[in-house]
A protein has these predicted regions:
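Signal peptide-directed extracytoplasmic domains
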Residues: 15, 25-172
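Short non-domain terminal segments
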Residues: 2, 6-8, 77, 247, ...
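N-terminal start-of-chain detector that recognizes signal peptides
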Residues: 3-7, 50-51, 74-76, 118-119, ...
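N-terminal type II signal-anchor transmembrane helix
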Residues: 2-30
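Intrinsically disordered, low-complexity segments enriched in polar/charged residues with Gly/Pro
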Residues: 8, 18-21, 63-66, 89, ...
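Bacterial extracytoplasmic/cell-wall-associated proteins, especially those involved in peptidoglycan
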Residues: 114-125, 132-306
Length: 306
């Protein structure tokens, strides 16, 4: 037993010595991706190419001695050049991968999401939008905080976001939508309009009810948010000419809902459509760009604007 302990201590000393054998003077952090299914030798080669270790054999031998060799995990890591072999092995063994935090705000369009991700060097905007447009996923990229590893593909990002939408959109929502005679796409489309129109949380259900009342009566929705989407106008004041733009998204010209969502709504806006306020209001307008004034009759609506 004493001999075994001595050998074990000796091996630990060797590991410590070798783990500090190659320490760069640079304190630089380096992002390195270990491909899925890589062997210990292949991992060592990647680390050597990035000048994080000085010798492949030393790395492989230490990984065998420590028992880490069969448990090293793939992924994207953030290594410091002065980490040393043992610390790198521990990170690979624990799977301490590096990821970027990305918060997608409620109401962002797919294009805005693509721009945000491109700024963080996580995707190519054009590739991202091609996938979104091909599968008509505007509205289904759920706004939330995500952690993405560098090197992730555009499709993987989209899959994560649409999967989150699937988790948030409960089965009971489908039953409620049927009661309102709405399809899922109708719900998401209307929720996206509510998301853009609402300035404060308390008004979401009131705004949703106005639009539902208008749909029921066969009126134009007359949502300025749909005009902005059609014109790709995010902030400039709209003109009367803008309200006449020929677009399937123009709810001043076309009856019913637009062809699809105009942004990616959050859960509160989706719930507002499915569980709207109890009201007969048919009109609303924003007062000083803040809260809204609601009315049942047109005359009352005009009077409040004076």
């Amino acid at each position: 037993m004493k001999i075994f302990n001595l050998i074990f201590i000796f091996l630990l000393v060797v590991i410590v010595i070798y783990s500090g054998y190659y320490l760069s003077r640079s304190n630089e952090n380096l992002i390195v991706t270990i491909p899925y299914g890589s062997t210990t030798k292949e991992i060592a080669k990647v680390l050597l190419e990035n000048k994080l270790i000085s010798n492949e054999s030393i790395f492989v031998n230490i990984s065998k001695i420590t028992g880490f060799s069969k448990k090293l995990q793939s992924g994207t890591y953030k290594f410091n050049r002065r980490s040393g072999t043992l610390k790198i092995l521990l990170m690979l063994w624990k799977g301490k991968t590096f990821s970027l935090k990305v918060t997608v705000p409620e109401g962002y369009t797919a294009e805005q999401i693509a721009e945000l991700l491109q700024e963080k060097k996580l995707c190519d905007k054009e590739k991202f939008m091609k996938l979104v447009d091909k599968n008509r996923l505007e509205g289904y990229l759920f706004p939330d905080t995500y952690f993405f590893s560098p090197g992730i593909s555009e499709q993987e990002i989209i899959d994560r976001m649409t999967a989150e939408f699937g988790r948030q959109y409960l089965s009971e929502f489908n039953n409620k939508a049927k009661e309102l005679r709405l399809t899922k796409n109708d719900v998401v489309s209307l929720a996206s309009i509510v998301e853009k129109e609402a300035k404060i949380e308390e008004e979401r259900k009131l705004i949703a009810r106005v639009f539902l009342n208008r749909l029921k009566k066969g009126w134009h929705l007359e949502s300025c948010a749909t005009i902005r989407y059609a014109l790709k106008n995010s902030g400039k004041p709209l003109t009367y000419k803008d309200l006449k733009v020929k677009s399937p998204y123009n709810t001043y010209r076309n009856y019913g809902l637009p062809p699809g969502p105009i942004c990616n709504p959050g859960l509160l806006s989706i719930k507002a459509v499915l569980y709207p306020a109890d009201s007969d209001n048919m009109f609303f307008f924003t007062k000083n760009g803040g809260t809204h004034q609601f009315s049942k009759y047109y005359d009352e609506h005009i009077k409040k604007q004076r």
